[in-house]
Amino acid sequence: MKIVFLGLSITSSWGNGHATNYRALVRELSGRGHDVLFCERDVPWYAENRDLPRPPWGRTALYDSVEQLRAEHAEDVAAADLVVVGSFVPEGVAIAEWALETATGTTAFYDIDTPVTLAKLRGGDREYLAPDLVPRFDLYLSFTGGPTLEVLEEEFGAHRVVAFYCLVDPDAYRPVAAEKRWDLGYLGTYSDDRQPALKRLLIETARRAPQLSFVVAGPQYPPEIEWPDNVERIEHVAPGDHPAFYASQRFSLNVTRPEMRAAGWSPSVRLFESAACEVPVISDRWEGLEQIFTVDEEILIADCAQDVFDFLGETGEEESACIAGRARERVLAEHTAERRCEQLEREVEAVPAR
């Protein structure tokens, strides 16, 4: 197939969890023989932090404006068998309208932020999607599964809504040998709504356990945050360094944004990445998680700092290795780029011809 992605960013992972997802997907699709073009808005904050300026798979095109995108890539969109518009694309409504009008093949909205999208649609926020556009896509690929799929169909008229969870590239995310530097680590960009959970599960645990070491990696954390002395801060970890970063932790913490926790069935890309690196994961609790991983066998669930403290103190090396190994096996079986590409191919094939 000829496939065009109109996505947030594939060239920069700075503050952008979409990047590793897109990279793995484009790499796998290209490897399966598809002709893939990724169009990305050239914005200063990504331009200054490009860790993959020229992706080696498919083609990548940068554009400065919607007008430039239309002028230079109308033929690509019109000729594509599949056009995928992603969430959080700058001027996404205008781009989606143009893509839907121009495309002659299958169209899909790839929502890597489904609960946030629903909140925006209900609140009249047209940052990257509008309610009237939802039914016009042939496919709605949702980061979130569970009851949210019915909401998209019944409340917004979406067609062929499918749970299209985040994915991991097993060649990029794999176990590596590294000295254990931290007892618990977290990788993620700062978010106002996610910070209370990070404070509850990591910062408070660090205060209770000054003899242990912790790390929080990611950009945009405000300077006024009071970090305990045993919490190390790292501004950015490039994707190529993620496996070594994870391997340097005894446990990795997964924290979910409130909208996604409320919706449930919203596994993050970091969750799959750390599991693929065979590091045991401690996660906050949300509905549907038990369908992604078997609790206590493939993942540990914490509601408060005491839970985390107990896991760190009571889970032996052999037990944690077994948990990590089982989680990696589950990810490799169900959540790789190969599995998602197979799913995408099936879904596109099932869309009725225009």
Model-derived regions, located:
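Extended catalytic core of nucleotide-activated donor transferases of GT-like folds
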Residues: V4-S9, G15, Y22-R27, R32, ...
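Catalytic binding pocket for nucleotide-activated donors in carbohydrate/polymer assembly enzymes
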Residues: G7-G15, N21-A24, S30-G31, L37-W45, ...
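Short, solvent-exposed loop/turn segments at secondary-structure junctions
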Residues: S9-S12, D42-Y46, F88-E91, D113-V116, ...
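Proline-centered loop/turn at the N-terminus of a beta-strand
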Residues: G105-T106, L139, R160, S213, ...
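Hydrophobic residues at beta-strand termini and immediately following loops
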Residues: F164, L187, A302
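Conserved catalytic-core segment of nucleotide-activated headgroup transferases in glycan assembly
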Residues: N21, L167-F251, R261
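Anion (oxyanion) recognition and catalysis
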Residues: S30, L100-E101, A108, A206, ...
